[in-house]
Each structure stands twice: as structure tokens, then as C-alpha cells.
From Swiss-Prot:
Modified residues (Phosphoserine): S382, S431, S479
Coiled-coil intervals, chain numbering: 539-712
Alphabetized InterPro entries for the sequence: c-SKI_SMAD4-bd_dom, DHD_Ski, DNA-bd_dom_put_sf, SAND-like_dom_sf, SKI/SNO/DAC, Ski_DNA-bd_sf, Tscrpt_reg_SKI_SnoN
Organism: Equus caballus
Pfam families given in the database record: c-SKI_SMAD_bind, Ski_Sno_DHD
This protein's name: Ski oncogene
Length: 730
């Protein structure tokens, strides 16, 4: 038995299996890709090599004395210490920011959201403005080459884009692309990084040779999306968008903000890029490592700083502090000279000192140090450097809040190997069959309440306080429900599902407690078992203590038994009264909950109707605005055509125009002269007519006078004859 126990205690797994399990564990804890990212083939090959070495060593004949053979000794593999227990993953709530901002991409203003510190641009707006000359097939092929991932916007972000008029109201979803991937995509499509035609290569080569030989050029490089070297000509940097950097590969000139995106080497398509912005080119362009002289480095570094300070209106670029010593620390050289040795305690101190040296401002101007120490504002993360030169602290805090256990608090794309910490253990309370069931079977996380609330519900088993943790999630769901028909139906179903267990528990408690009244007092243990567990813990403990004392004291006499039965009946009546009060309170709370549910449903319906009306009004206003914009565009085009015609008329030759005007004026003068002649003729004719009329009038007057002379003399003679007779009569 002892041998068996000793053999069982000293058992160790297979060395290859142990290494595989260790690497499997480390890969699963340090990678979001999970254990699938680890291949155990190299571990098996290493084990085969070790076993082959051991077999070769065993094959060498050893001198054995002929006197007696020693007993065979079983050599077990060396016991390796277990790997250190790594801390759990560091969980943080996902950033679901809905604050809209704007950014400039290739001269176009694009709407975006800042999510997790990275700008995520509206992809349809980019396709309709910056990349409008490219087909979707071309864009998709470039996205596949660059391994670009586009996420989907949330419902709130989609609603904001619709309200701002960026997307139509009929858009079901919208893609978001990071600013870094947008810069890469636009650069690959618009500029492409292609070489110039062969006919211009000699000219470009001669120009590049001239720039290299010139003392006014500075060799620079960047490490964004693959390293690229170039020649900076400070004199050509006359404007923020001036082409002043020549690529040494394609011999083309680029502005600084385009040069940091330009590359001909490995495009780092399988690298996770974050936080790139071409406007920060001052942090990406570095002085070339080819300059070895201290004075030359200082002079050219000052020249590069002067270029970076030009047109820096935001004063974002600050000059680097000059280094104190020109040589790197001794710890740096020692660390770089012996990278393969296992670090001892002193070497670990030196490594930490090297890290502090890199972090200090004095090392920021090192020009010709080890490539691992070069300062780069945009360098891909290297796992080899981090594992060999940096050490993780032994215990990292794994901050996981209770409120983050719900699946809605994390990103939907969490790797399956990331194990969430289990929620707080619920207290198991042994309750009689008639007790209200508080903790049910496990349900999906979407319908569970938070662990703290469940724990409070279990710790306080009183019936009046039971519906309180059930009603709290109702208010939370009401406040978070969207004003849509689907969310309204989900809200109603969740209310019904949460309210149905309370009905079941109350009815079951009522059915189980009502027949308990008729239980004869002969069975006190059964009556005690049928007592509800919804009473306060203090009263129940006091009654149990009273029963225990009575049972321990003994029931020898009849009076003691009757007194004991009387106490049991009294406790039973008291428990029934408490249970009925609890059921009544629960029923009233449920009625109030039903009333609130109906009221909330009515308010939700009104809000839905108001939102529908508002959406119709917005759609009508949008249609009117589109109509007005169409009319304005048509009027603008018409005015533009008229302006073009007037401009073409004015463009004619001035001499031709003067001759045409002279001919025009002479024709007008001739017409006026003809009209004047006609007017003179008409005037002469009118004068002749007037003379004829005057002669006719004079002739008529003469005729009238003759007629008057012929008529008037006779009456005058008669008058003279009458007067003479009158004079004779008297």
C-alpha cells in the first residue's frame, strides 16, 4: 500500500503532454484568438529531439563491473515547477458613445463618432464623397487586401445620422470605419503608390541624385504601415500641402501628410492599427539613422524641427529636450549583447533601468542606438521585445464589476476562451414547501437581475419585501425601452414573464397554507414544518428557540403538554396572520404593477404615435427642402448658361464689335434720315392742305358776305319807308 501510495503521489504526466498543456494554457490566457492560435507541433518536435538525445546517451556502452549487476534504476523526468497563475482578463465596459463630430478626409468633411479614443467615420459618406469615382468591386478588393474591418453602428448612432440628414430615413444600417483604416483605404485607391512611367525614371533619378548630393536635403523616414525612406527639402515646404519629400523608391514628391501614408514595403495588413492621423505627421517623420556624426545629427535634427514647427498653428509640436550624454547607458549594451541568456536578478534590474532610460526625455534624441531603442511614434507592437525586455507585475488587478455580468455590457465579439468570473454565490436557504420561491433555475443573462439584488432578495425572506426586487428591473426596462413597436412587445412580454412567477408563488403558498389550519394539534412537528418561511428571521429564530427549550425541558405532565400545544397553536395563528398580510400586500403590489404597466403601455403608444408624426413631418420637410434645392440648382444652371452666353458675347474682337456698332448706328441714322424726309414731305403736304383750306374758307366767307349783302339791303329800305310814313301821320 505504501508503495502504491508513493507511486501514485510521485506520478507525473508525460513531458510532451505537460509542455503542450502549459503552452495551451499560456496561449489561451494571453491571446484573444484562444488556444486555436497555438500549434503543439513544435513542442512535440522538441520532445522528440530530447528523447533522441537521451536514447543516444543511453546507447553509449558504460563500463559495468563483472562482479554483480546493479538493479535497474528508473529515471523519471525532472519535475518542472508549475507555471505561475496568471491573472484574469481585464474587463471594461464597451464604449457606446453617440456624440457626433466631424473630421477632414482628403479635403472632405466626414461625420464620425469617437469610440474608445478612435474616430469611426461614416462609410457611406466616404463612398459618396471621397471614393465616388471608384466602384464597389474595386473598394471591396482593396479592403480585402488591407484586411480592413468595418463595424456596424448602434441604433442610437444610426438615428443621429438620420436626423442630421447624412443618411436617409430608410437606411437599415450604416458601416463605420476607423480613421486609420480610412486613411489606408483612400491612399491605396487614390494614390496607389505606383511607380512613375519608364520615360520619366531617368529624369527622376537625376533629380533624386541632385537632391541627395545637395546639402539642403535631409534624409528622413517613417514607420507607418511599412517603413519608407525619403528626402526632405526644407526650401520646398512653402505651404502646408506643398510637396517637399521625395520617396527614395518611386522618386515621387509628396507632402508630409501624404508621405507618412506612402509605402512600398510590407503593408502590415495583419497588424491592428489604432490612432493614426495624417495630421500628426510631425510625430511620425524621423531623422534617418544613416547620419552618424554628432554635429551632423544636431544640425539636421534642428533643421527637421524647424520644418515641423512651420505652419503648426495649433502648437502641437514641441522640440525635444537635448540629450545629456551621447553614449547609451551600459545596461543597454549589455542587454543587447546577451539577448539569449536567461535574465538574472541583476540583468532584470538593468532591463528595468533600460526601460526607464527609454522613458526618460534624455533618450528621446538618441540617433544611432540599437533599433530596439529607437523612438518611433507609430511602431507596431512587437511581442518578442515585450516578452524579452518587459516583465509583467506578478499580480494584476482583475476589475470585474457585478453590473457587467450581463452580456449587453460587453462587446458581442468576445473570444470564447475569455472566461468571465462567476457571479456572487447565492445563499441557499432551506425553506419549507410553502415558502415563496425566490431563486429559480438558471435563465439567460438577458432576463436575470443583478446578483446583488438577488442576494438581497434571498437574505430578506419577508413576503412584503419580495416583489421589490422584481419591480426594480421593470422600471429599469421601462427607462431603457426604445419607442418602437418591437421594443414595446418585448417590454410587455418581459413584464408578463416576471409577474407570472409571483402569481404562482402566491397561489402555491396560499394553497399550501390554507389546509394547514385544519391540521390537528397532535402533530406539532408537521405544523412547524408547514409554517411559512416568509416571516422575519428574528421572529422565526425566537419561535424555534422557544420550541427547542420546550422540547429540551421535557413534557412529562399533562399540563406541560397542553401548554406546549397551546403555544404551538398560538404560533401557528400568528404565522397565518403574517402570511395573509403578506399575501394581501403582494396582491395590492401586483395590482399596482398592473396599473403601472397599463399606464406605461399607454404612454409608450402615445410616444410612438408622436414619434411617427414627427418622422412624417421631418420626411415632408426633407421632401420640400429637396424640391427647393432642385429648383435652386435648376435656376443656378440657367443663370450659369446665361452668364456663359454673355461671356461669349463679350469675348468677341473689340474692333469687330466697334465696326458692328458703327454699322448699326449708321443704319439707325439712315433710318432716322428717311423718317425725317418723310416727315418733311408730310409737313409740306399739310402746309399745302392748310393753304387750300384757308383759300376755301376765304372763298366761303366771301360767298357768305355776298349772300348777306344780297339779303340785308331790302329789309333796310322797308324800314326807312315805314319811318317816313310814321312821321307823316302825326
Amino acid at each position: 500500500m505504501e508503495a502504491a501510495a508513493g507511486g501514485r503521489g510521485g506520478f507525473q504526466p508525460h513531458p510532451g503532454l505537460q509542455k503542450t498543456l502549459e503552452q495551451f494554457h499560456l496561449s489561451s490566457m494571453s491571446s484573444l484568438g484562444g488556444p486555436a492560435a497555438f500549434s503543439a507541433r513544435w513542442a512535440q518536435e522538441a520532445y522528440k529531439k530530447e528523447s533522441a538525445k537521451e536514447a543516444g546517451a543511453a546507447a553509449v556502452p558504460a563500463p559495468v563491473p563483472a562482479a554483480a549487476e546493479p538493479p535497474p534504476v528508473l529515471h523519471l523526468p525532472a519535475i518542472q515547477p508549475p507555471p505561475p497563475v496568471l491573472p484574469g482578463p481585464f474587463f471594461m465596459p464597451s464604449d457606446r458613445s453617440t456624440e457626433r463630430c466631424e473630421t477632414v478626409l482628403e479635403g472632405e468633411t466626414i461625420s464620425c463618432f469617437v469610440v474608445g479614443g478612435e474616430k469611426r467615420l461614416c462609410l457611406p459618406q466616404i463612398l459618396n464623397s471621397v471614393l465616388r469615382d471608384f466602384s464597389l468591386q474595386q473598394i471591396n478588393s482593396v479592403c480585402d487586401e488591407l484586411h480592413t474591418y468595418c463595424s456596424r453602428c448602434t441604433a442610437d448612432q444610426l438615428e443621429i445620422l438620420k436626423v442630421m440628414g447624412i443618411l436617409p430615413f430608410s437606411a437599415p444600417s450604416c458601416g463605420l470605419i476607423t480613421k486609420t483604416d480610412a486613411e489606408r483605404l483612400c491612399n491605396a485607391l487614390l494614390y496607389g503608390g505606383a511607380y512613375p512611367p519608364p520615360c520619366k525614371k531617368e529624369l527622376a533619378a537625376s533629380l533624386a541624385l541632385g537632391l541627395e548630393l545637395s546639402e539642403r536635403s535631409v534624409r528622413v523616414y517613417h514607420e507607418c504601415f511599412g517603413k519608407c525612406k525619403g528626402l526632405l527639402v526644407p526650401e520646398l515646404y512653402s505651404s502646408p500641402s506643398a510637396a517637399c519629400i521625395q520617396c527614395l523608391d518611386c522618386r515621387l514628391m509628396y507632402p508630409p501628410h501624404k508621405f507618412v501614408v506612402h509605402s512600398h514595403k510590407a503593408l502590415e495588413n495583419r497588424t491592428c492599427h489604432w490612432g493614426f492621423d495624417s495630421a500628426n505627421w510631425r510625430a511620425y517623420i524621423l531623422l534617418s539613422q544613416d547620419y552618424t556624426g554628432k554635429e551632423e545629427q544636431t544640425r539636421l535634427g534642428r533643421c527637421l524641427d524647424d520644418v515641423k514647427e512651420k505652419f503648426d498653428y495649433g502648437n502641437k509640436y514641441k522640440r525635444r529636450v537635448p540629450r545629456v550624454s551621447s553614449e547609451p547607458p551600459a545596461s543597454i549594451r549589455k542587454t543587447d549583447d546577451t539577448p539569449s541568456q536567461h535574465p538574472t536578478s541583476s540583468e532584470k534590474d538593468k532591463q528595468s533601468g533600460w526601460l526607464r532610460t527609454l522613458a526618460s526625455p534624455s533618450s528621446k534624441s538618441l540617433g544611432c542606438v540599437h533599433p530596439r531603442q529607437r523612438l518611433s511614434a507609430f511602431r507596431p507592437w512587437s511581442p518578442a521585445v515585450s516578452t524579452s525586455d518587459k516583465e509583467l507585475p506578478p499580480h494584476l488587478p482583475a476589475l470585474i464589476r457585478d453590473s457587467f455580468y450581463s452580456y449587453k455590457s460587453f462587446e458581442t465579439g468576445v473570444a470564447p476562451n475569455v472566461a468571465l468570473a462567476p457571479p456572487a454565490q447565492q445563499k441557499v436557504v432551506s425553506s419549507p414547501p410553502c415558502a415563496t420561491v425566490v431563486s429559480r433555475a438558471p435563465e439567460p443573462l438577458a432576463t436575470c437581475v443583478q446578483p446583488r439584488k438577488r442576494k438581497l432578495a434571498v437574505d430578506t425572506p419577508g413576503a412584503p419585501e419580495t416583489p421589490v426586487p422584481v419591480a426594480a428591473p421593470e422600471d429599469d426596462k421601462d427607462s431603457e425601452a426604445e419607442v418602437e413597436v418591437e421594443s414595446r412587445e418585448e417590454f410587455t412580454s418581459s413584464l408578463s414573464s416576471l409577474s407570472s412567477p409571483s402569481f404562482t408563488s402566491s397561489s402555491s403558498a396560499k394553497d399550501l397554507s390554507s389546509p394547514g389550519v385544519h391540521v390537528p394539534p397532535v402533530a406539532p412537528a408537521a405544523a412547524d414544518a408547514a409554517a411559512p418561511a416568509d416571516t422575519p428571521s428574528s421572529g422565526l429564530e425566537a419561535e424555534l428557540e422557544h420550541l427547542r427549550q420546550a422540547l429540551e425541558g421535557g413534557l412529562d405532565t399533562k399540563e406541560a403538554k397542553e401548554k406546549f400545544l397551546h403555544e404551538v397553536v398560538k404560533m401557528r395563528v400568528k404565522q397565518e396572520e403574517k402570511l395573509s398580510a403578506a399575501l394581501q400586500a403582494k396582491r395590492s403590489l401586483h395590482q399596482e404593477l398592473e396599473f403601472l404597466r397599463v399606464a406605461k403601455k399607454e404612454k409608450l403608444r402615445e410616444a410612438t404615435e408622436a414619434k411617427r408624426n414627427l418622422r412624417k413631418e421631418i420626411e415632408r420637410l426633407r421632401a420640400e427642402n429637396e424640391k427647393k434645392m432642385k429648383e435652386a440648382n435648376e435656376s443656378r444652371l440657367r443663370l450659369k448658361r446665361e452668364l456663359e452666353q454673355a461671356r461669349q458675347v463679350r469675348v468677341c474682337d473689340k474692333g469687330c464689335e466697334a465696326g458692328r456698332l458703327r454699322a448699326k448706328y449708321s443704319a439707325q441714322i439712315e433710318d432716322l434720315q428717311v423718317k425725317l424726309q418723310h416727315a418733311e414731305a408730310d409737313r409740306e403736304q399739310l402746309r399745302a392742305d392748310l393753304l387750300r383750306e384757308r383759300e376755301a374758307r376765304e372763298h366761303l366767307e366771301k360767298v357768305v358776305k355776298e349772300l348777306q349783302e344780297q339779303l340785308w339791303p331790302r329789309p333796310r329800305s322797308e324800314a326807312t319807308g315805314g319811318e317816313s310814313t310814321a312821321e307823316l301821320e302825326p
